[in-house]
Amino acid sequence: MERVILIRYGEIHLKGQNRPFFEKALHKNIKNSLRSFPDVKVIRAQGRYYVENYEDEASIIDALTRVFGIVSISPAYKLGKDFDLLGAAVEQMTATYLAQRPADTIVSFKVESRRADKTYPLNSMDISKKLGSRLLSAYPDRLKVDVHDPDLRVNVEIREHAYIYHQV
């Protein structure tokens, strides 16, 4: 499991034939904003940018918030697409979140899944249901489901790798 920063960008996809120009400009601006972090890698894949190989997450996120065209930034975990591995990682991320809350607090949650890789054996709804069930089994006294206004929103994206995060 590797820490990454997931970057979503705006309406570049609507620009038609100019799209490559705008994507290159955004990539250049992202790299320029991170020039004081020489070991950082910026990767573009499937409509997202990913920042890898970093140490100072807060400073990098702060630098990225100043880049025009970025819609949202999420600290995330990148891992393989094996469902058991994914479930264990979601449990671990949830445990970290719960450890930051008072022990007697019941936290409402929701699992949201997006499956860009349509060859993945489970659809988005099944991924959300199974991971949600696993979390309820793991933390029955700490979690309750609330799909409308949850305290914790566990996000799962299945792409070339699996990505999990809870901050958007």
Where are the regions a protein language model picked out?
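RNA-binding accessory domains that recognize and position tRNA/RNA substrates
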Residues: M1-V168
